[in-house]
Curated annotation (Swiss-Prot):
Its main location: cytoplasm. The keyword Ribosomal protein does not apply. GO terms for cellular component: cytosol. Disulfide bonds: none annotated. It holds the Pfam family RrnaAD. Specifically dimethylates two adjacent adenosines (A1518 and A1519) in the loop of a conserved hairpin near the 3'-end of 16S rRNA in the 30S particle. May play a critical role in biogenesis of 30S subunits. The gene is rsmA. It is found in: Cytoplasm. It comes from the Bacteria. It catalyses: adenosine(1518)/adenosine(1519) in 16S rRNA + 4 S-adenosyl-L-methionine = N(6)-dimethyladenosine(1518)/N(6)-dimethyladenosine(1519) in 16S rRNA + 4 S-adenosyl-L-homocysteine + 4 H(+). One of its GO terms (molecular function) is 16S rRNA (adenine(1518)-N(6)/adenine(1519)-N(6))-dimethyltransferase activity. This is Ribosomal RNA small subunit methyltransferase A. The keyword Repressor does not apply. Belongs to the class I-like SAM-binding methyltransferase superfamily. rRNA adenine N(6)-methyltransferase family. RsmA subfamily.
């Protein structure tokens, strides 16, 4: 079933406070949809559908998809385009506060898609990771710099807290770049598409994931300082000198496996 409305968004201006940059390049839209490979049986949710450019392609394969949109002015416009699909649902709310768990079950995990507002992308990814057991995969358009951070390994200048904590939960794939001219208005930065696939069986398991998160956050708090200096700020009675690790190393030199082992040594 084809979407007949050619330009339902005429007159709607992108809002800076919502971080809106509308994707308009059909070639890129097609490439994103091919990467996702939507199916009718998918439990698909799109965050920030904007003009509905990607939605229009996805919904033809998955008519029961849902979207989460904060901008209330976009709701009637999206309904005008997609109300012909009886199972299409819109949640007019802030994705940062939304309980994505209510949309999924272990038998029907979510597939999450989104052109995420760059000003909230990192906290939103951390929010979504908390629902990792209920998510099959995630495909996001993000600032290229954020994608590089997500995919970075030890020793890379982009490697940090976001890298470690995302890779603890997910396999990360940097798929392809998207130049500014593909958007209206044009962002001042390059963008990229990333695929995050939560592990069904994690390669490294922390006994206390909350402690691992605290450890990683503390270790990267001041990147130029050594582990010895940063880990003093854990505010717990810990014998750091007894650890089987060189405390003169910096946070960006430790692998995910080393962080998990360190966490399990400190908090068995």
């Amino acid at each position: 079933m084809k979407n007949k409305n050619t330009d339902p968004m005429q007159g709607h201006r992108a809002r800076k406070r919502f971080g809106q940059n509308f994707l308009e390049d059909q070639g890129i839209i097609n490439a994103i949809v091919r990467s996702i490979g939507p199916k009718a049986s998918d439990n698909l949710v799109e965050i920030g559908p904007g003009k509905g450019a990607i939605t229009a392609q996805l919904i033809e394969s998955c008519p029961s998809m849902q979207v989460v949109e904060l901008d209330r002015d976009l709701i009637p416009i999206l309904l005008a385009q997609f109300a012909i699909y009886n199972d299409f649902r819109i949640h007019q709310t802030d994705a940062l506060k939304f309980d994505f768990g209510q949309l999924a079950t272990p038998e029907r995990p979510l597939r999450v898609v989104g052109n995420l507002p760059y000003n909230i992308s990192t906290p939103l990814i951390f929010h979504l990771l908390s629902f990792g057991e209920l998510i099959a995969d995630m495909h996001f358009m993000l600032q290229k710099e954020v994608v590089l951070r997500l995919a970075a390994g030890p020793g890379d200048k982009n490697y940090g807290r976001l890298s470690v904590m995302t890779q603890y939960v997910c396999q990360v794939e940097n798929l392809f770049e998207v130049p500014p001219e593909c958007f209206n208005p044009r962002p001042k930065v390059d963008s990229a598409i990333v695929r995050l696939t939560p592990y069904r069986t994690q390669p490294f398991v922390a006994a206390h994931p909350d402690k691992l998160a605290k450890l990683v956050k503390t270790a990267f708090a001041q990147r130029r300082k050594t582990l010895r200096n940063n880990l003093k700020n854990l505010d717990e009675e810990l014998d750091l000198e007894a650890l089987d690790i060189d405390l003169t190393r910096r946070a960006e030199s430790l692998s995910l496996e080393e962080y998990v082992n360190l966490s399990n040594t400190l908090w068995p």
